[in-house]
């Protein structure tokens, strides 16, 4: 009983990271992820109805049209109405699923007036970040590397294989653009609770955007097999208030 109680408490506090035996989504922190979760629920609704209907037809056919009940088979060559029905009905269902998914796909690719642009570079096996909107007195961009935190350096409550030495700090309620590329092999920058995943390809710049609605710490990982230490490339985003973000930028520039 204690285990389940504390698991529930941890779930409510640490709802922006994966938890043991999780089969659902992490709590959405962006409108995009909310749309993905809602689309999933809508599709599951249609899926349950289809499964129930098809199962009912299947069992009805097995019990009412077997060799004992109907020793002589009916001689049907075709049925125009039923053929139209089983062609049009799935088409309408697919259209009903496709229309909202197209709108969601379009909104994912839309870049809305980003206030902050961050460049993420995938390397074997760590991430580098560059805040190109800010420069110090020596005309250098605000930039840093982000390595996985060794297990012996973890503090109580921190996650093994998910913590880093330098987090990405961004403000809430702000349109953020991430430009993603790779320095050596193909990586993938992904944060599930934000609903973002973007391939980091050497020689190519890809971009994604998001709008975080609440403060918190969001965890992700490289999602493209990139070598022996692929599993040691975590991503940690800390969303803070705008005032805290400005203070962090000032301290970083002074450093």
Curated annotation (Swiss-Prot):
Example GO BP? ATP synthesis coupled electron transport
Residues recorded as binding Mg(2+), renumbered to this chain, are 224
Disulphide bridges: none
* Reported cofactor(s): Cu cation
Where in or outside the cell it occurs: the entry states: Mitochondrion inner membrane
Reaction(s) catalysed by this chain, per the record, are:
4 Fe(II)-[cytochrome c] + O2 + 8 H(+)(in) = 4 Fe(III)-[cytochrome c] + 2 H2O + 4 H(+)(out)
Instruction: Provide the transmembrane region boundaries.
Output: 43-63, 84-104
Residue intervals on the Mitochondrial intermembrane side: 1-42, 105-255
Q: How is the cofactor bound?
A: Binds a dinuclear copper A center per subunit.
Listed GO molecular functions? copper ion binding; cytochrome-c oxidase activity
Q: Which UniProt keywords apply?
A: Copper, Electron transport, Magnesium, Membrane, Metal-binding, Mitochondrion, Mitochondrion inner membrane, Respiratory chain, Translocase, Transmembrane, Transmembrane helix, Transport
Q: Which domain of life is it from?
A: Eukaryota
Kindly state one GO CC term assigned in the UniProt record.
mitochondrial inner membrane
Q: Does the keyword Membrane apply?
A: yes
Mitochondrial matrix topological domain residue ranges? 64-83
Q: What is its EC number?
A: 7.1.1.9
* Binding residues annotated for Cu cation A2, in chain numbering: 222, 224, 226, 230
> Gene3D superfamilies from the xrefs?
1.10.287.90, Cupredoxins - blue copper proteins
| Self-association and partners | Component of the cytochrome c oxidase (complex IV, CIV), a multisubunit enzyme composed of a catalytic core of 3 subunits and several supernumerary subunits. The complex exists as a monomer or a dimer and forms supercomplexes (SCs) in the inner mitochondrial membrane with ubiquinol-cytochrome c oxidoreductase (cytochrome b-c1 complex, complex III, CIII).
Query: Which purpose does this protein serve, as stated in its record?
Result: Component of the cytochrome c oxidase, the last enzyme in the mitochondrial electron transport chain which drives oxidative phosphorylation. The respiratory chain contains 3 multisubunit complexes succinate dehydrogenase (complex II, CII), ubiquinol-cytochrome c oxidoreductase (cytochrome b-c1 complex, complex III, CIII) and cytochrome c oxidase (complex IV, CIV), that cooperate to transfer electrons derived from NADH and succinate to molecular oxygen, creating an electrochemical gradient over the inner membrane that drives transmembrane transport and the ATP synthase.
Tell me the protein family, please: Belongs to the cytochrome c oxidase subunit 2 family.
Q: What is this protein called?
A: Cytochrome c oxidase subunit 2
The organism of origin for this protein: Cyanidium caldarium
Q: What is the lineage of its organism?
A: Eukaryota, Rhodophyta, Bangiophyceae, Cyanidiales, Cyanidiaceae
